[in-house]
């Protein structure tokens, strides 16, 4: 992982740990999770890696290998307003977690994505990867649903993306060689194993050459149009 090598070059020490959150694909159910529909999905073996080390002074200092500008803020004094950059996902995660738990320890780190940005829920992956590291250095344990809801709140309430919980659920619940089935109305879920009677298969993901951000594709307008269509 390049993030580990860059971390060692920059900080002249081994990272404390490397956090990981996979990307996800959703064969059926995309865009109906925010209308309490039933979805399925699975995680893939690519995702977000973050090499990090705790900082006892409470400072979060992260550099992305995919975006310019280093993120830096106090974990217990997150700016109230988003800043309009990639690090809003980190700030939102820290703010939502800090509303429930006392955060004292920050972290320094290098974060990287292994595929082009957009289409595989990379924003949710960044948040969950960062949350898992922030929880670890502060001695906090989140149950799976609490992790999902905290990550979702970071996007909804801080970043300003009106997403549902499909992305976060796939990334938290998914298991190798299983398909996740989730009812977003009551949050019940099932991990369906690959049948021994199935023929071998592979999942192919194609990059169109276009990168996008949910903040720039009128995602909220898309939801409004979908709701109007239902009516």
Regions found by a protein language model. Name each.
Residues 179-197, 206:
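A short helix-breaking turn/cap at a secondary-structure junction
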Residues 29, 36, 190-193, 213-216:
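Short helix/loop capping segments that flank catalytic or ligand/cofactor-binding pockets
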Residues 101-102, 194-200:
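Short glycine/proline-enriched loop/turn "hinge" motifs that connect secondary-structure elements
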Residues 125-127:
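FabD-like malonyl-/acyl-CoA
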Residues 25, 186, 208-212:
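Glycine-rich beta-alpha junction loops
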Residues 221-224, 228-231:
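Single conserved hydrophobic/aromatic residue that forms the stacking wall/gate
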């Amino acid at each position: 992982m390049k993030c580990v090598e860059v971390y060692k070059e920059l900080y002249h020490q081994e990272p404390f740990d490397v956090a990981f959150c996979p990307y996800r694909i959703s064969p059926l159910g995309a865009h109906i999770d925010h209308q309490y529909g039933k979805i399925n999905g699975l995680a893939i073996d690519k995702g977000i890696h973050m090499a990090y080390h705790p900082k006892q002074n409470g400072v979060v200092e992260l550099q992305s290998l995919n975006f310019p500008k280093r993120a830096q803020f106090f974990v217990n004094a997150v700016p109230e307003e988003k800043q309009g950059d990639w690090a809003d996902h980190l700030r939102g995660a820290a703010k939502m977690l800090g509303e429930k738990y006392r955060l004292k320890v920050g972290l320094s780190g290098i974060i990287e994505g292994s595929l082009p940005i957009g289409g595989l829920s990379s924003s949710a992956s960044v948040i969950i990867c960062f949350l898992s590291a922030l929880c670890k250095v502060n001695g906090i344990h989140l149950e799976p649903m609490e992790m999902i809801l905290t990550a979702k709140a970071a996007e909804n309430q801080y970043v300003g993306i009106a997403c549902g919980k499909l992305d976060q659920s796939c990334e938290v619940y998914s298991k190798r060689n299983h398909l996740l089935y989730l009812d977003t109305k009551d949050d019940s879920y099932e991990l369906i194993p690959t049948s021994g009677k199935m023929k071998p298969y592979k999942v192919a993901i194609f990059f169109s050459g276009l990168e996008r951000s949910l903040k720039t594709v009128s995602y909220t307008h898309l939801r409004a149009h979908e709701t109007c269509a239902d009516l």
